[in-house]
Amino acid sequence: MDMETSWRFLRSVCLLSFILGSFSVYQTLCLVDAQEDAIVTLQVDASNVTRRPIPETLFGIFFEEINHAGAGGLWAELVSNRGFEAGGQIIPSNIWPWSIIGDESSIYVVTDRSSCFERNKIALRMEVLCDSNSCPLGGVGVYNPGYWGMNIEEGKKYKVVLYVRSTGDIDVSVSFTSSNGSVTLASENIIALASDLLNWTKKEMLLEANGTDNGARLQFTTTKKGSIWFDQVSAMPMDTYKGHGFRNDLFQMMVDLKPRFIRFPGGCFVEGDWLGNAFRWKETVRAWEERPGHYGDVWKYWTDDGLGHFEFFQLAEDLGASPIWVFNNGISHNDQVETKNVMPFVQEAIDGIEFARGDSNSTWGSVRAAMGHPEPFELKYVAVGNEDCFKSYYRGNYLEFYNAIKKAYPDIKIISNCDASAKPLDHPADYFDYHIYTLARDLFSKSHDFDNTPRNGPKAFVSEYAVNKADAKNGNLLAALGEAAFLLGLEKNSDIVEMVSYAPLFVNTNDRRWIPDAIVFNSSHLYGTPSYWVQHFFTESSGATLLNSTLKGKTSSVEASAISFQTNGKDYIQIKAVNFGEQSVNLKVAVTGLMAKFYGSKKKVLTSASVMDENSFSNPNMIVPQESLLEMTEQEDLMFVLPPHSFSSFDLLTESENVIKMPISDSYKKTSTM
């Protein structure tokens, strides 16, 4: 081959390579463009023919005493084991978390059964062996660190109550101090003669903090020799919600979800591992000093039951939410009461309803009235047990409760533990309870599980749902997206699903019995997990109108819904969509059946750089909804971009004579979030 021929051949090869390479790049670019331009269409029918009202009760909350959600959490009592009963009734008993200040040569501390409270006989006796000349500087005594440290804030006031008696004169310093006692944040002395303390005497004081410490403790110290008894010690911040005892910041986190109901007090907390440790409402009412408290053996900690039957109903009222009371039906995790012997439990349930609904002259209504609430609470729903359907005596016991309650209170709606989503129940019920905990991908796929549930039976109450397996970690974006898709499915099936709540609601970071949870807190700080923020996307859903919608295109990673709602006299169509995939998705929204223009749009997006990202105390707002305003263009269809691994909502302001306007009851007025 000569030189010229060689150059021609080489040029041909280069040209061919360039053409083939260009074609390959072109194909790649076309593929990328195709991916970027791929459109998923949500067809929305806004006409009156297909619209359907969403139940007023659809989204609520479930409060269980787990993870120190109440004791050391929502219930603002700072003292743990305030009556010294946690160590049991055999004396001498363990006084944990109380600790002694001083050594064995200067003080001796022991429990005895000398209390003036018949249901709480344990008291603390403090034998002071030293005097002002021999006691260590600052004196000797006892201290209580509360629940992993008390949050004492400068300028705030705290009410301290205690019962005391003595065989001699006393001079006791009652103080909030730093965790090691070296810094005094607030203090007052109890000075009394022996003649004034021969019998148990109640002492109250208001301490104002001159410093801040979120790991503080309450301590009693003295340098006066003698015997002193203490019992029923309480320390409460004065700024609880309406003075009702609820920690303000945690209460506000619940309020912001606009819950339409609150299910309480459990959960497994209601059952107990053994019936002897189950929650029994009658032991949680009347004055707090008279409540014996109990050991919750499922979640392995003591509760003084300051957050009791009365307080739960007060909480529901303060939230503007319907109470759903779950009571024990004679069944725990490990033992059961046979149906022939269950009537005492039935009577306890009837009495519990009377406590809430009875007039102030009734037996149990008078107890409620004496506690400061003469008017009855609203109670429309009760649940017979928790997750007990497959226990051998459940159905027999359930029928005893059902018949007795319907006879006494025919309007009350009764919730069965048995799942009717796949097959009919074999017993009467107004609602059936449905619980699901699973992987994120699995929960995403279950968004259509209620599509084929029979509509002629009891309604569904999805009272516990969450992604809680390994891929959820402590509460990440991945878990939240799976839950968001599931909730969209429940919203679209709200003709059968009438109530929904996440579980668990709270976790004290010092006692993570169950993870993940919606709200994480310690003594002074808190944050919402992505699962909490997902629920914010549904605050307008209860009582709104569901619009018939259909997704078309490659929708394996997308779920969406459409509703209309009204707030402050303005009408909105809200589009919500989950993108569970790794690529952005273009969402075209085509609305028919509505002669209206969209005058504005508010976009809200929940996403993060990594699907495994979590919020934390150091970065509590890493994953929170980001809101922005969108300008609307003059076009028939709407186009939105769904970022990878995201949950988005679009509130479209409409204006037309034909716009959907749903009446809103006085009890469910909506406030603007614009």
Curated annotation (Swiss-Prot):
Catalytic class of the enzyme: hydrolase
Signal sequence bounds: 1-24
Annotated function: May be involved in the coordinated dissolution of the cell wall matrix during abscission and in the secondary cell wall formation in xylem vessels.
InterPro entries attached to this UniProt entry: Alpha-L-AF_C, ASD1_cat, Galactose-bd-like_sf, Glyco_hydro_b, Glycoside_hydrolase_SF, Glycosyl_Hydrolase_51
Record's subcellular location: Secreted, Extracellular space, Extracellular matrix
Induction: Not induced by hormones or during leaf senescence.
Molecular function terms, GO-annotated: alpha-L-arabinofuranosidase activity
Family membership noted in the UniProt record: Belongs to the glycosyl hydrolase 51 family.
GO biological process: L-arabinose metabolic process
SMART domains on file: Alpha-L-AF_C
Glycosylated residue positions: N48, N180, N199, N210, N361, N522, N548
GO cellular component annotations of the record: extracellular region
Protein name: Alpha-L-arabinofuranosidase 2
Major subcellular site: secreted
Catalytic reactions of this protein: Hydrolysis of terminal non-reducing alpha-L-arabinofuranoside residues in alpha-L-arabinosides
Enzyme Commission number(s) of this protein: 3.2.1.55, 3.2.1.-
Keywords, alphabetical: Extracellular matrix, Glycoprotein, Hydrolase, Secreted, Signal
Tissue spec. comment: High expression in flowers, siliques and stems. Observed in the vasculature of older root tissue, at the tip of anthers and in the petal blade of fully developed flowers, in floral abscission zones and in silique replum tissue. Expressed in the cambium and phloem, but not in the xylem or in the vascular system of floral tissues.
Species for this entry: Arabidopsis thaliana
Inactivation phenotype: No visible phenotype, even in asd1 and asd2 double mutant.
